[in-house]
UniProtKB/Swiss-Prot annotation:
Family label: Belongs to the vitamin-B12 independent methionine synthase family.
Organism lineage: Bacteria, Pseudomonadati, Pseudomonadota, Gammaproteobacteria, Vibrionales
Gene name of this polypeptide: metE
Cofactors demanded by this protein: Zn(2+)
Free-text comment on the cofactor: Binds 1 zinc ion per subunit.
Pathway, per record: Amino-acid biosynthesis; L-methionine biosynthesis via de novo pathway; L-methionine from L-homocysteine (MetE route): step 1/1
Function: Catalyzes the transfer of a methyl group from 5-methyltetrahydrofolate to homocysteine resulting in methionine formation.
GO molecular function, one term: zinc ion binding
The protein, known as: 5-methyltetrahydropteroyltriglutamate--homocysteine methyltransferase
Active site: H699
GO annotation terms (biological process): methionine biosynthetic process; methylation
UniProt cross-references to HAMAP family, sorted A to Z: Meth_synth
Length: 760
């Protein structure tokens, strides 16, 4: 019998973001629900055909979502938040939960969207389920069953995928005090029984049930709940229990006791778990080996994976399945849409469509197909060639990396000395006012950027247009009487992509989009070689802006860890090494900025916290190199050069030591929505440097009043000495318009001026 091959899921957005554009048309009222559903059906059909035509044993159904697969599960379970429930749920119900509903919408009262948060340690976001003690679950949303029928009628052998009951509960939150959401499990399991029975009646043989929390360090109460859950939901379908993103070493002894028929493990994230899993695998279970990495863009070394899995095949026989490591949701759709890439670079990559082919080819090779074995060897050759390419592994970069010592991470003076130098050089008032960096990306800016990229504007013409926007931003800030100005970042489409386009070692794509949430997609750059800065990146823009004003101009950089976390990294070197390469490049930029007369430089690190590994025991090692990378970037600054960093998190307690270890002169943080509660972590830690707690929620169109900002600043002054407080918005203002921005900043400046007298 042939080796069973499958993937855990396929991108839902379409090759050219067709779903994104259709959703946004629907939300604007430009197409109706029938047209939207027709487009969705076409995307699903294409995805299933890709899998079946490649030779996979199963086509995966249930991976399509109009907004988010966790939200789809919420509706499947009849668990719509009460504020959005309105009889039988439909697509509009789903969108209200994900996006919220304004007061004027549909003639009804407004209702807030459910929270959104990161899906484990990926850059995908899910809609957080909400739980109350009286919640009931009733299968009422037919999408899964309809899509299974679609696939069966189209002639595909279907494997539905379903988020498991324990992961669904774990990933949610209680919205009332005094109860534990785990107590809802018995009620939830009844709904899962109904789902599996329905799938069995449709002729389904195998169901993929995703329980990614089995890769975490679970509390005993959660780990112990699995045995009951999988006894109760047992039905006539076979269950493949699916884990990903890390090893199951902490939960394996619990897993092998479960009443299921197979286990999927992520061998890309954790290859070392294979031997232990095989040793403990129950005799009747299948083992799905996730060897094709679903989280990246790199071609799989099929020759190496064949050699690795061949003895497993000999031992397990037909019980060995071959699969992607996780859903291909996290990979761009199709490499064939990138004709501009060189043949060499293209030979290094595999996007979702190509990864499907990899899984199928490896399966045939394990079945002894000689042509497939030879094809695996040929396919893997570019990976071997790349290892010795000097334009990938650059001697000059390696030499700099080898020269990194502890002294390279240290500023030349401690904070107290630096603060005295900076006070003298900068001449700033009490409660200095500034912004986080970006100003509104107007329609004019976007039109001019597009014209430049399509050749309709020359480099000179584009630069002149950008200087016009910078001059306008400086003029507006001076009129507002802000103390520290920024140039506004008109030249940047994205805070990471801009640096990727200007550093050697990156590759950008045209259609390398992946879903972030809902209709929002991102196009991460790809680290393809050792990273170095060949010329200054931001100096021209910052110095031009400084030439227009006598006030201090802040240079703006994206930090090394954030660039790393928001790109596709290399697989052949460690993340630590990539971060160090980025840090050295940014260090040179810091030196050039200060030598050009820029006295304040901000190095944004919004992603340090989200880069944390899933297992807490791995946190310290990560935080050590992440902090060191930031410090390498900043340590070339002279004592009189003030280094800022910006972070936007909802929780600082677990990383406050590391935040302090960054030794930034000023940290600006997002606090307005928490009413300054986030400052408790800094107060308890006795954070020694300067802090700018955000007083303007830039995610909302609401304009904060002067009185509101004053109240927030007074709260902040109770937790942080006023001599160390800055006044600023929560985040950059790229997504706001100028009217909102100027009105809010006028109130911010007025509040700061008033409190300088009161709090002095």
């Amino acid at each position: 019998m042939a080796t069973t091959t499958h993937i855990l899921g396929y991108p839902r957005i379409g090759e050219k973001r067709e779903l994104k554009f259709a959703l946004e048309k629907y939300w604007r009222g430009e197409i109706d629900q029938a047209e939207l559903k027709q487009l969705g059906a076409g995307l699903r059909e294409k995805n299933w055909n890709t899998q079946t035509e490649a030779g996979l044993s199963f086509a995966t159904a249930g991976d399509f979502a109009w907004y988010d697969h966790v939200l789809t599960t919420t509706l499947l379970l009849g668990h719509t938040p009460k504020r959005h429930a309105n009889g039988f749920p439909d697509l509009d119900t789903l969108f209200k939960v994900g996006r919220g509903q304004s007061q004027s919408g549909c003639g009804s009262a407004g209702a807030a969207a459910s929270d959104m948060t990161k899906w484990f340690n990926t850059n995908y976001h899910y809609i957080v389920p909400e739980f109350s003690k009286d919640d009931a679950f009733e299968v009422s949303w037919p999408q899964l069953f309809e899509e299974v029928n679609e696939a069966i009628k189209a002639g595909h052998k279907v494997k539905p995928v379903l988020l498991g009951p324990l992961s669904y509960l774990y990933l949610g939150k209680e919205v009332e005090e005094g109860f534990d959401r785990l107590t809802l499990l018995p009620r939830l399991l009844t709904a899962y029984q109904t789902i599996l029975s329905k799938l069995a009646s449709q002729g389904v043989e195998w169901v993929q049930i995703d329980e990614p929390i089995l890769s975490l360090e679970l509390q005993d109460k959660w780990a112990d709940a699995f045995k009951l859950a999988y006894q109760v939901i047992r039905s006539d379908v076979k269950v493949l229990l699916t884990t990903y993103f890390d090893s199951v070493s902490d939960t394996l002894d619990k897993i092998v006791e479960l009443n299921v028929d197979g286990l999927h493990i992520d061998l890309s994230a954790s290859p070392e778990q294979l031997d232990e899993v095989i040793a403990k695998l129950p005799e009747h279970w299948v083992l799905s080996a996730g060897v094709v990495n679903g989280r990246n863009v790199w071609r799989t070394d099929l020759s190496t994976q064949f050699a690795r899995l061949q003895p497993v095949k000999e031992r397990l026989g037909d019980r060995l399945w071959v699969a992607s490591s996780c859903s291909l949701l996290h990979s761009p759709v199709d490499l064939d849409l990138e004709p501009a890439l060189s043949d060499e670079v293209k030979s290094w990559f595999a996007f979702a469509k190509q990864k499907v082919t990899e899984v199928a080819l490896l399966g045939r090779a394990l079945d002894g197909d000689r042509n497939a074995i030879l094809a695996c060897e040929t396919y893997s050759q570019p990976i071997q060639d790349r290892k010795t390419a000097t334009h990938v592994n650059k001697p000059q970069v390696q030499e700099r990396l080898n020269s990194i010592t502890a002294s390279l991470t240290q500023r030349s003076a401690p904070y107290a000395e630096r603060a005295a130098h900076q006070a003298e050089v900068l001449g700033l008032p009490l409660l200095p006012t500034t912004t986080i960096g970006s100003f509104p990306q107007t329609g004019d800016i976007r039109v001019q950027r597009s014209a430049y990229r399509t050749g309709k504007l020359s480099q000179t013409e584009y630069n002149q247009a950008l200087k016009g926007h910078i001059a306008d931003a400086v003029k507006r800030q001076e009129a507002l009487d802000l103390d520290v100005l920024v140039h506004g970042e008109a030249e940047r489409n994205d805070m990471v992509e801009y640096f990727a386009e200007n550093l050697a070692g990156f590759q950008t794509t045209k259609f390398g989009w992946v879903q972030s949430y809902g209709s929002r997609c991102v196009k991460p750059a790809i680290v393809v070689a050792d990273i170095e800065r060949e010329k200054p990146i931001t100096v021209e823009w910052s110095t031009y802006a400084q030439s227009l004003t006598s006030k201090q101009m802040k240079g703006m950089l994206t930090g090394p860890v954030t660039i790393l976390c928001w790109t596709f990294p290399r697989e052949d070197i460690t993340r630590k090494e990539i971060a160090e390469q980025l840090a050295l490049a940014l260090r040179d930029e810091v030196s050039d900025l200060q030598d050009s007369g820029i006295n304040i430089i901000q190095i944004d690190e919004p992603a340090i916290r989200e880069g944390l590994p899933l297992k807490k025991r791995d946190h310290d090692a990560y935080l050590q190199w992440a902090v060191d990378a930031f410090k390498i970037s900043a340590a070339s600054a002279k004592p009189e050069t003030q280094i800022h960093t910006h972070m936007c998190y909802s929780e600082f307690n677990e990383i406050i030591d590391s935040v302090a270890a960054l030794d930034a002169d000023v940290i600006t943080i997002e606090t307005s929505r928490s009413n300054m509660e986030l400052l408790k972590a800094f107060e308890a830690f006795n954070y020694p440097n300067e802090i700018g707690p955000g007083v303007y929620d830039i995610h909302s169109p609401n304009i904060p009043t002067q009185e509101w900002i004053e109240a927030l600043l007074k709260k902040a002054a109770e937790k942080v000495p006023v001599q160390r407080l800055w006044v600023n918005p929560d985040c950059g203002l790229k997504t706001r318009n100028w009217d909102e921005t100027e009105a809010a900043l006028a109130n911010l400046v007025s509040a700061a001026k008033k409190l300088r007298t009161e709090l002095a």
